[in-house]
Regions:
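N-terminal export leaders
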Residues: 1-2
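Short, well-ordered beta-strand elements
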Residues: 22-37, 57-61, 162
């Protein structure tokens, strides 16, 4: 009987629908062990649900910053909210991310102590719209969304928004 159960337990994507679901929903990864992160991510999902409903945002949670880093670096997730220090450590391969070299990481917006991060291959048009929506509706957020700064580069779509350029067409 164990042999029968084993394949279904080992396969985390048994029906192969997870990539399809990710394509049609913006899954924003939150950090379970950071209370402020959870509140911020919940507010971001709420603002996007009301003002950018086509994004179909949903909160998903990871145990800690390390898990978020692994999910982003291995292309299992596209966007997350992390502490700014953790995002910098991931980008620079510093502990607890010392084994994750050249992590593909960009910032869409900064919330002060936290940042909304994504992979560089995240569509520029989508990053632009997220930055635009979150900065325009700061009243719904515990901290205002501002232009990225620091070691981790801004995503090119967010950079275009904050530079006052046209929305990218990718």
């Amino acid at each position: 009987m164990l042999a029968v159960l084993r394949p279904s337990l080992a396969d985390l994507n048994p029906d192969r629908m997870w990539p399809v679901y990710r394509r049609y929903h913006l899954l924003i990864v939150s950090q379970r062990d950071d209370e402020h992160n959870g509140a911020l991510t919940t507010a971001v999902v709420d603002v996007l649900s009301r003002h950018l409903p086509a994004s179909r945002p949903q909160l998903v949670s990871a145990a800690d910053a390390r898990r978020i880093g692994v999910l982003i670096a291995t292309n299992q997730q596209d966007v997350a909210i992390m502490q700014a220090d953790s995002a910098e450590a991931l980008f620079l391969a510093r502990p607890p991310f010392a084994d994750i070299h050249e992590a593909p990481l960009r910032i869409i917006v900064s919330f002060g102590s936290h940042v909304f991060v994504c992979r560089p291959d995240f569509m520029a048009r989508h990053a632009y719209l997220l930055a635009q929506t979150l900065t325009a509706h700061a009243e719904g957020l515990p901290a205002a969304a501002t232009a990225p700064s620091g070691v981790v580069p801004a995503h090119r779509g967010a950079q275009a928004f904050f530079a006052g350029e046209e929305i990218p067409d990718d």
